[in-house]
Curated annotation (Swiss-Prot):
Has a central role in coupling the hydrolysis of ATP to the transfer of proteins across the thylakoid membrane. It comes from the Eukaryota. This is Protein translocase subunit SecA. It is a peripheral membrane protein. It comes from Emiliania huxleyi. CDD domains: DEXDc_SecA, SF2_C_secA. The gene is secA.
Length: 881
């Protein structure tokens, strides 16, 4: 009964956009009659109106219509009405749930262009460098056509390049680069080192992957800290002889390891220590990490070991490697020891932030994905984002067949191989999604035994390089593609194959044979291979995406204008030959698409249910795009992780009661409901985990925002003298407060000691001169301090003019950074210990907030004291050589 209600609710939520879509369409005929320059002039007029405080609602329809027309002129693509609705939803700061193949990339053009007109910079966030570069080069042409600048942030860019690109109107960037640039900016020592502008508006592609899946892992910038290598080596050897369920217990659901009493005693005897938990020499964390490394972290599942003998984490949601990321709290070192690799130093956190708090810094946030509805509650509770499903342009024709469950892994993989063989015999394309590298290679080996051709895509470097090409051609006739998790792959699978990708592959194939030759001669050649070779540098330079005559002509002429190719006379021959090839290949692909459509389209095979229904839905969603036919089926085993942890025994009893043959699968509505129930339990568990992380991090977030705001003002302020004077006076106030509340020392001795300790110089005070009034005493101290500071300033300025301002800034930044680093360590230790408070009938979160705030206030006081102390103690040495 509820389903019709929700369906009507969301239909009503979209109804409000219908009038805007009609208005956008009404601008179409007028805009189509304008020249390119006239459209750009219209953009400038609208921009001025927006900057003159004209209501955005008054111009949004015309702006969207302009983007639609520009997209058609540059990419030969025209937005559908449902795509316009998607753009309006994004502009309202919501999440647009759009199925795979519905054109999310061009939908993002609409709100990004409108918000870029404010001149504050707009970010389009993607999950990897390849997608960021692809979008900047392809759809970025629309923004450039309309007069905007387009920036791109890549992993290997220098700070100067990053700053230049962040100044652009629209910036394409990955979530990783965005977060680390934010942290680095807040560690900068000069304003010139800061690369980002204030965070204004952001569209997050694959928003569920970034804001949900990666929310538990904070971004951390760390510095080296010496690792106790011997402890890791000893406990790694110890873990090898410890026995499960005797010495330790594994809670696989919660990823927790617990030592038994027998295990604790055994470890203490083996390590020849009195107490594993000794505060002065603790061993327990090393033992537990070594057991976790042995039992819970599996090579080629959770990580790989590369040729440089480094442990590289594999993202469980995307199947991609996470270069540069390390597990914290000694776990990474424990895995290195387990693999007999060099143990890297432990790291000390210098700065950190979660994606939850990073993206909440934007004035306006929106996102898009094919699968967000299952996490709707979390998006609304934590980010304040509503999920709005956008109707598909064409009805989804994919058939999702019931799951097949087998008694063991052997029977399951045999059935999957047989399914692949059956599909291959009729030339129907198949996409198989696996959960780990190990399992993808197991299936590959099995298909090799049957002489069935396949393409393999997993986190191994040699496979990643061909990722886009492998995925784009997964819809070719007879193609069998084995892939680890498909989340965030970002490339549509077109039935019959992708023409653009085919051309790219052909061009790259010939680039190695490219030799110096007269371009005019090559253009006249009838040999198409030579023609392709000659086109490689042009293609590589401009990253052509829409390969038609107009775009080729435009980019070639621009290339020629640079004087690289002196003779333009044969351009027409070149374009004619090129378009001839396009038409020929397009006709062949159309024939193949027709054939594959008759066969039923792309068939998707899932080899295991993921803990999240979203990931399963993402895999299914690769089939049946844009009204194409397709199908999906999951093949499961009772010893799959999800079934094993959540009800495998019950299902096994069901199988036995039914009395099926050993190799016969089971499929039933009861089974499907059990699986969905198991997934919901896991999703609730992880949601609670992320919610708890968010609640705890809120206290630190307020502190981080405060310290970063202060730091930013330090960089921007021309003179910090007034601040330093205020710091000194606050320090003196702290001293007088301490004296008035608690001291047994004589007044003069107390102040001499405290001012020496905190300010680096003893102040002389007499209680009689203050007439017994603490405020009079404080004013006397302030006067002494100001005189002392002025004298110190004069002394240093006489040696080197301007040095005092530099010292103030330098000492202040150094103390903020050093104190913040120590504060993060203390907060981390507090969070580790606070969990035990619940056993004492106390609320750990309340205690954490109180104690973290107290620690923060202490840190601020320490910064003030230390800055003054170092300034007064500073000396300048003059080198006369």
């Amino acid at each position: 009964m509820l389903e019709p209600f929700f369906k009507n609710y969301f239909n009503q939520s979209l109804t409000k956009y219908n009038s805007q879509v009609d208005a956008i369409n009404n601008f179409g005929p007028m805009l189509s009659n304008l020249s390119d320059d006239e459209i750009r002039q219209r953009v400038q007029i609208l921009k001025q109106q927006l900057l003159s405080n004209k209501n955005e609602a008054d111009i949004i329809c015309e702006v969207f219509a302009i983007v639609r027309e520009a997209t058609f002129r540059t990419l030969d693509i025209k937005h559908f009405d449902v795509q316009l609705i998607g753009g309006l939803v994004l502009n309202d700061g919501q999440i647009a749930e759009m199925k795979t193949g519905e054109g999310k990339t061009i939908v993002a053009l609409l709100p990004t262009f409108l918000n870029a007109l404010y001149g504050k910079g707009v970010h389009v966030v993607t999950v990897n460098d390849y997608l960021a570069r692809r979008d900047a080069e392809t759809v970025g042409r629309v923004h450039r056509f309309l007069g905007l600048t387009v920036g791109l942030i890549q992993e290997d860019m220098s700070p100067e390049e990053r700053k230049q690109n962040y100044q652009c109107d629209v910036v394409y960037v990955t979530n990783n680069e965005l977060g680390f640039d934010y942290l680095r900016d807040n560690m900068a020592f000069t304003q010139e080192e800061v690369v980002q502008r204030p965070l204004f508006y952001c569209v997050v592609d694959e928003v569920d992957s970034i804001l949900i899946d990666e929310a538990r892992t904070p971004l951390i910038i760390s510095g080296p800290s010496e690792a106790p290598t011997q402890k890791y080596l000893q406990t790694s050897q110890l873990a090898r002889v410890l026995q499960k369920n005797i010495h330790y217990i594994i809670d696989e659901k919660n990823q927790v390891v617990k030592l038994t009493d027998e295990g604790t005693l055994f470890c203490e005897q083996a390590l020849k220590i009195a107490d594993l938990y000794s505060p002065s020499d603790p061993w327990i964390s090393y033992v537990l990490n070594s057991i976790k490394a042995k039992e819970l972290f599996i090579r080629n599942t959770h990580y790989i070991v590369n040729v440089e003998e480094e442990v590289i984490i594999v993202d469980e949601f995307t199947g991609r490697t996470m270069a540069g990321r390390r597990w914290s709290d000694g776990l990474h070192q424990a895995i290195e020891s387990k693999e007999n690799l060099p143990i890297q130093d432990e790291s000390q956190t210098l700065a950190s932030i979660t994606y939850q708090n990073l993206f909440l810094l934007y004035d306006k946030l929106s996102g898009m994905t094919g699968t967000a509805k299952t996490e709707e509650l979390e998006f609304e509770k934590i980010y304040g984002l509503k999920v709005i499903p956008i109707p598909t342009h064409r009805d989804v024709k994919r058939k999702d067949f019931p799951d097949l469950v087998y008694k063991n892994q052997y029977l399951k993989w045999q059935a999957i191989a047989n399914e692949c063989i059956k599909m291959n015999e009729i030339d129907r394309p198949v996409l198989i999604g696996t959960t780990t590298i190990e399992k993808s290679e197991l299936l590959a080996a099995l298909l090799s035994e049957y002489n069935v051709p396949y393409r393999l895509l997993n986190a191994r470097p040699e496979n990643i390089e061909s990722e886009a090409e492998i995925v784009s051609q997964a819809g070719c006739r007879g193609a069998i593609t084995i892939s680890t998790n498909m989340a965030g792959r970002g490339t549509d699978i077109a039935l019959g194959g992708n023409l653009e990708s085919l051309l790219k592959v052909k061009l790259k194939k010939f680039i190695s044979d490219l030799v110096s030759a007269d371009f005019s001669t090559v253009l006249k050649s009838a040999q198409f291979d030579e023609f392709l070779v000659s086109f490689v540098p042009v293609f590589e330079t401009f990253g052509l995406s829409k390969l038609n005559e107009s775009s080729v002509r435009e980019d070639l002429l621009e290339y020629l204008n640079e004087g690289i190719i002196p003779d333009r006379s044969d351009i027409t021959d070149f374009i004619t030959a090129y378009n001839s090839f396009l038409k020929e290949r397009a006709a062949i692909l159309l024939e193949e698409k027709t054939l594959i459509t008759k066969l039923g389209g792309l068939h998707v095979i899932g080899t295991e249910r993921h803990e999240s229904r979203r990931i399963d839905n993402q895999l299914r969603g690769r089939s049946g795009r844009q009204g194409d036919p397709g199908s999906s089926r999951f093949f499961l085993s009772l010893d799959d992780k999800l079934l094993r942890l959540f009800g495998g025994d019950q299902i096994l009893n069901l199988l036995q009661n039914i009395g099926l043959e050993d190799d016969a699968p089971i499929q039933s509505p009861i089974l499907t409901k059990s699986l969905e129930s198991a997934q919901k339990k896991v999703e609730v568990y992880y949601f609670d985990s992320r919610k708890q992380l968010f609640e705890y991090d809120q206290a630190l977030t307020m502190q981080r925002n405060g310290i970063y705001s202060e730091r930013k003002r330090v960089l921007e302020k021309e003179s910090l003298r007034d601040w330093i004077i205020e710091y000194g006076e606050r320090s003196l106030y702290d001293i007088t407060l301490a004296f008035s509340t608690n001291t047994n020392l004589a007044l003069d001795k107390f102040f001499a000691l405290k001012t020496q300790e905190l300010l680096g110089m003893p102040y002389q005070v007499k209680w009689e001169s203050a007439k017994g009034d603490i405020n009079v005493l404080l004013n006397n101290l302030k006067h002494q301090f100001q005189v002392s500071y002025t004298l110190k300033e004069a002394q240093l300025e006489a040696i080197e003019p301007g040095i005092m301002r530099e010292l103030e800034r330098s000492f202040l930044l150094q103390q903020i950074d050093f104190s913040w680093k120590e504060h993060l360590q203390k907060i981390s230790a507090l969070r580790d210990s606070i969990r035990w408070r619940s056993y004492g009938q106390r609320d750990p979160l309340t205690d954490y907030k109180k104690e973290s705030y107290s620690t923060f206030v202490t840190m601020l006081n320490r910064i003030r004291h230390q800055v003054i102390y170092f300034i007064f103690r500073s000396k300048i040495t003059i080198d006369f050589e």
